[in-house]
Amino acid sequence: MLRVARIMKCLTSSKAAALDAELMAPSGGFSIDQLMELAGLSVAQAVYKYDKSLAQGKQVLVLVGPGNNGGDGLVAARHLCHLGAKPVIYYPKRTDRPLFNGLVTQLHNLDIKFLDDVNKSTFDSSAHVIDSLFGFSFKPPIREPFPKVIELLKETKTPTTSVDIPSSWDVDRGPEDDNAFQPSSLVSLTAPKGASRHLLPSTRHFLGGRFVSKHIADKYDLEVPAYEGLDHIVELTQNNKEAQI
């Protein structure tokens, strides 16, 4: 049974950036590789919890952006493949860095398909979509080739999970208008961001952060929930109205 935590406080974008920097500083001891692996594992677990039937070889479309949020999506795709799902990757604007090149190689070694383009048919033929286009460092405008992808996310009826922030949303203020893309579920990483207050009541909200020390939690006034068993995620209650920290 999935444990459901109580409503939690939110981090502002500036606090989230400071927290990430501290985790990767000598005093924090984490590397970007470690944090990306933990994030991607959390996303994969949340998607699996959302629909366990994906493990029966169903197609999961993973939309990958050029930054670390996209790296989280690549890691999630690998884990979902090992869980029995069939990920396909759309990664139109690649990051030429050893970490990202290694993640791509891992997926090629699993015979995971990379797509040259996506359209409505791609979304319709998928059982689930992972939105790992933009993270908490996103600043508008949305540049090519992503405007078309955001429109497809708005229109699709396929269940969609966003990584940390629904793509195109302001990290603190949420969607720019009532016509913005709304995911079926969100996986907040380390702590929820302010945008999560603007999720629809029906949206499932997961937290992935089973690595936060008491020192970090106290410094940033984070609430560390109780995780169940081997889970790296916990499901949060909806309608988060807490003040930002």
Curated annotation (Swiss-Prot):
Which SUPFAM superfamilies does its entry note? YjeF N-terminal domain-like
Q: Which positions are annotated as binding K(+)?
A: N69, D131, S167
User: What residue ranges carry the coiled-coil annotation?
Assistant: none
| Keyword set includes Electron transport | no
Free-text cofactor note: Binds 1 potassium ion per subunit.
Where does the record place it?
Cytoplasm; Mitochondrion
Which cofactor(s) does the record list?
A: K(+)
Please give the InterPro entries that the UniProt record associates with this protein.
YjeF_N_dom, YjeF_N_dom_sf, YJEFN_prot_NAXE-like
Q: Which NCBIfam families match?
A: yjeF_nterm
Q: What is this protein called?
A: NAD(P)H-hydrate epimerase
**Which organism is the protein's source?**
Yarrowia lipolytica (strain CLIB 122 / E 150)
